[in-house]
Design a protein with these regions (language model features):
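Juxtamembrane regions of bacterial inner-membrane/periplasmic proteins
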Residues: 1-274
Length: 274
């Protein structure tokens, strides 16, 4: 029994060290793929965009909708909220808060989709490691690059070009609201043949996305106003206006080739079936 416990302790410490080393490497490395992408299978349309080239509207909407405490309370987990979430889970109640951005990012990078209590504990442990390894600006940048916005669409670069035909530095506030509506259930999100997000109530997926986007269009502006609007960027230490930045690495100002191919394939398919 003692040998088994020692073995488990060694395994845990080894994994803990490996996770910490990986998170530290994220200061310089952009992960080409995540555990979440691999679990989903299929293609991974995933092109990197630097935070300074993301529209202030997109950044502010993301913070207000996903984690308004990120600018001022940079911890992996709010432990009071986490305990309330655990209690709600044990009571089979709805999660009263949702996961903060560091926790979402940590699980997307290294874990599998599940509501298992063990996975939730790992979420919290990894999130705490993550915030001690990289800055809050880098956490937000990685989150915007790893979040899923469609069945095979990952990150703001591919999402803005796919749905709107525009780079992420040119996204409007209303478009940002729509993308926030996609986040809860990205597997149901599709592009309209003419561009934009399909919200056709006559189709099951369109009906789902219509409801989620309408919900986001109601709540995100309210949250944004309550949390200080674009002042959230100042609190994050972000001064870039995105569109005025000169071209450079990670600007995502050209449509990714894979996105161009996907749109063309969908248009051909739509022409055949119409």
């Amino acid at each position: 029994m003692r040998h088994a416990l020692v073995y488990l302790a060694v395994v845990f410490l080894s994994l803990d060290f490996a996770a910490e080393a990986y998170f530290i490497s994220l200061n310089w490395m952009n992960p080409p793929v995540t555990a979440y992408m691999l679990e989903g299978g299929g293609e991974h349309l995933h092109d990197y965009v630097s935070l300074k080239y993301v529209s202030p509207y997109m950044i502010a909407a993301t913070i207000a909708h996903e984690d308004a405490q990120l600018p001022t309370q940079f911890t992996g987990v709010d432990w009071n909220q986490w305990w309330n979430r655990v209690t709600a889970y044990l009571r089979h109640s709805k999660d009263p808060y949702g996961s903060p951005i560091p926790e979402q990012l940590a699980k997307n990078l290294l874990l599998w989709p599940s509501k298992n209590p063990i996975r939730k504990i790992l979420d919290a442990v990894l999130a705490e490691q993550l915030v001690h390894a990289i800055s809050k600006q880098r956490v937000l940048e990685l989150y915007l690059n790893e979040a899923q916005f469609g069945p095979d669409i990952y990150g703001a670069c591919d999402a803005t070009w796919y749905y709107f035909g525009e780079p992420p530095d040119d996204i409007s506030l209303n478009q940002a609201y729509e993308l926030m509506g996609v986040l809860p259930s990205p597997v149901h999100a599709h592009r309209r043949p003419s561009g934009g997000i399909d919200m056709n109530p006559a189709t099951p997926d369109g009906r789902i996305e219509r409801g989620l986007i309408q919900n986001a269009e109601f709540y995100v502006p309210r949250d944004l106003e309550f949390d200080g609007g674009l002042n959230l960027l100042t609190e994050m230490g972000i001064t870039s206006t995105a569109y005025s930045e000169p071209n450079g690495p990670g600007d995502c100002r050209s449509m990714p080739p894979d996105i161009r191919k996907l749109i063309a394939a969908e248009q051909r398919s739509s022409a055949v079936t119409s």
